[in-house]
């Protein structure tokens, strides 16, 4: 079986792009800014990532009660439909490459295995990024500085 993944460099470049954006922003503003990285606005607080040609291209946007963007996530790999040793090796390798690249750029990650392996970085400027190795994919969640501050105040 063959699966696709965006490069770890591309995933981290996307995070760096969003970390360097002016915050706060509404979901509509985020959708428009996303066009600079090849993402297209979609219905109702969503974006689409056609550039990396992964099996799941949706980029859902979460919003705070104030109407500001809280976070959004994107797939760094295809979604694996048939589980097995080959799929596990693919996902493990892609996750390891992503964590290695993130560590080179942002320093040591806070690691967790609570719901599967994940690595979290609190970035300069206040934003937060989490790379996760799920059962069927590797994902990246970007949290805006405003919502990351809320999470820190809650002890998360």
Question: Which functions belong to the PLM regions below?
Answer:
Residues 1-116, 128, 133-156:
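Short helix/turn-capping signatures at newly exposed starts of structured segments
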Residues 124-126:
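Glycine-centered tight beta-turn/hairpin loop motif at sheet-sheet or coil-to-beta transitions
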């Amino acid at each position: 079986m063959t699966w696709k993944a965006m490069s770890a460099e591309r995933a981290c470049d996307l995070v760096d792009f969003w970390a360097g954006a002016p915050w706060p922003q509404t979901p509509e503003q985020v959708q428009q800014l996303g066009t600079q990285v090849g993402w297209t606005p979609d219905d109702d607080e969503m974006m689409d990532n056609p550039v990396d040609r992964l099996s799941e291209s949706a980029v859902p946007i979460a919003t705070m009660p104030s109407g500001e963007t809280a976070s959004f996530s994107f797939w760094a790999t295809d979604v694996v439909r048939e589980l097995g040793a080959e799929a596990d090796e693919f996902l493990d390798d892609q996750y390891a490459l992503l964590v290695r690249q993130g560590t080179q750029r942002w320093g040591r990650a806070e690691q967790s295995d609570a719901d599967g392996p994940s690595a979290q970085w609190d970035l300069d400027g206040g934003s937060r990024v989490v790379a996760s190795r799920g059962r069927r994919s590797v994902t990246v969640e970007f949290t805006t500085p405003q919502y990351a501050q809320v999470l820190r105040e809650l002890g998360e």
